[in-house]
């Protein structure tokens, strides 16, 4: 492990040289994984993506190429926020990997306005693609730069705003997302009003009535704040109780931008990327999220981490990244045997616009329905195919007969195994 850690930078630089070219996209995101022990100096309490409140955790970031192939990883203390990791990635792309022109893609919580201004804007050749948060979208509507009423279907439109003079803004509208958010808001507001009514009742009971302006406010925040709907209510809290009323104007204002999101891009000219390409580039962050799911769940399982020294923890995460690098390439090669959609470009071309979700290609739908490949052979998940390949073993045989030397013998591959080995470009001497 120490041997591997000492060579991490050299290995990552080699991967970058192979897969990151001048002007390419570099996808970056951060996740966390929790700790059971308490002696690792990196393990701190922070925002848990695993929903493990109160547990110590570490954070680690993953830098990938535009297809989601891992290039580099970095471990951070568990209390380090997403934006505070951006500077090191920008430095890595420019200095360690030697890229003179690159586009860093990160989500709205990662590439905040402060990080763009302080860490990216002054770096020549380093462009960025991200998205605006909800508050910023509202501000654009209020200043008149964005007009939601002009959209009635899936749509993409580039706008300009004096608030972002050196950036390109692309408004996207997704009616399906609009409907989903509206339904979710109705559901959350119903729960919010139910909880508020319960607390209000507690302040009015005859015995042990809940009293105290601060106590009532704290309980409201504790029991109701998690639904994030208090912004739509006007609360009047007194020492002996409180009243609440729905703010319909606030609800209407939020509903007006349901289904809208805005992509922001800096230092990217229109002749380099069209509006739709900016949208598709941002959506490629889902490839990093897919990598995190693989690293943290069924296939690789990054935890539990049985290390406490920083160097060993960093080596452990790096080893997991390298394992995912191998798995990524295996899945690419074995795609004809899996349920993988091999015609994603065809499916993308069938969309009305880039804001519309990508449906499965006709061939992928056929795969899912018939569960066979184009030659009628049964398809597999990656996990079941790996179980099948585990049946191929190499035995070292020592005969009990004097004079006969030790020899090795491999399992003769079955048809499915043979097909997989051929796709992977591997030879078997099984007999």
Predicted features by range, described:
Residues 1-431:
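Anion-binding and metal-coordination hotspots
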């Amino acid at each position: 492990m120490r041997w591997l850690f000492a060579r991490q930078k050299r290995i990552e630089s080699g991967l970058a040289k192979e897969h990151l070219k001048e002007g390419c996209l570099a996808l970056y995101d951060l996740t966390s994984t929790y700790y059971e022990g308490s002696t690792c100096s990196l393990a701190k309490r922070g925002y848990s993506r695993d929903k493990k409140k109160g547990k110590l955790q570490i954070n680690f970031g993953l830098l990938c190429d535009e297809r989601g192939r891992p290039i580099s990883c970095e471990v951070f203390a568990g209390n380090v926020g997403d934006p505070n990791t951006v500077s090191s990635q920008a430095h890595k792309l420019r200095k360690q990997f030697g890229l003179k022109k690159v586009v860093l893609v990160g989500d709205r919580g990662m590439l905040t306005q402060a990080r763009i201004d302080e860490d990216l804007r002054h770096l020549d050749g380093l462009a960025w693609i991200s998205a605006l948060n909800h508050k910023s979208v509202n501000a654009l509507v209020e200043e008149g730069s964005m007009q939601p009423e002009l959209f009635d279907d899936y749509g993409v439109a580039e706008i300009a705003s004096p608030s972002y003079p050196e950036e390109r803004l692309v408004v996207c509208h997704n009616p399906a997302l609009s409907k989903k958010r509206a339904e979710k808001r109705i559901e959350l507001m119903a729960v919010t009003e139910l909880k508020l009514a319960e607390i209000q009742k507690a302040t009015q009971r005859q015995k042990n009535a809940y009293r105290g302006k601060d106590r009532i406010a704290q309980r409201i925040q504790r029991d109701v704040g998690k639904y994030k709907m208090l912004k739509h209510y006007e609360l009047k809290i007194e020492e002996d109780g409180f009243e609440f009323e729905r703010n319909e104007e606030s609800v209407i204002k939020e509903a007006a931008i349901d289904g809208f999101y805005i992509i922001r891009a800096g230092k990217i000219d229109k002749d380099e990327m069209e509006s739709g390409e900016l949208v598709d580039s941002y959506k490629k962050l889902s490839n990093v999220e897919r990598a995190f799911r693989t690293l943290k769940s069924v296939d690789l399982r990054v935890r539990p981490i049985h290390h406490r020294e920083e160097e060993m923890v960093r080596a452990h995460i790096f080893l997991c990244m390298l394992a995912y690098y191998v798995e990524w390439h295996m899945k690419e090669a074995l795609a004809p045997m899996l349920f993988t959609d091999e015609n994603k470009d065809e499916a993308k071309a069938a969309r009305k616009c880039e804001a519309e979700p990508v449906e499965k290609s006709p061939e992928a739908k056929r795969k899912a329905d018939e569960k066979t490949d184009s030659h009628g052979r049964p398809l597999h998940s990656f996990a079941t195919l790996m179980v099948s390949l585990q049946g191929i073993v190499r035995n070292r045989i020592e005969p009990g007969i004097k004079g006969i030397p030790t020899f090795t013998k491999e399992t003769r591959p079955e048809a499915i195994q043979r097909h997989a080995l051929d796709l992977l470009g591997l030879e078997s001497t099984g007999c």
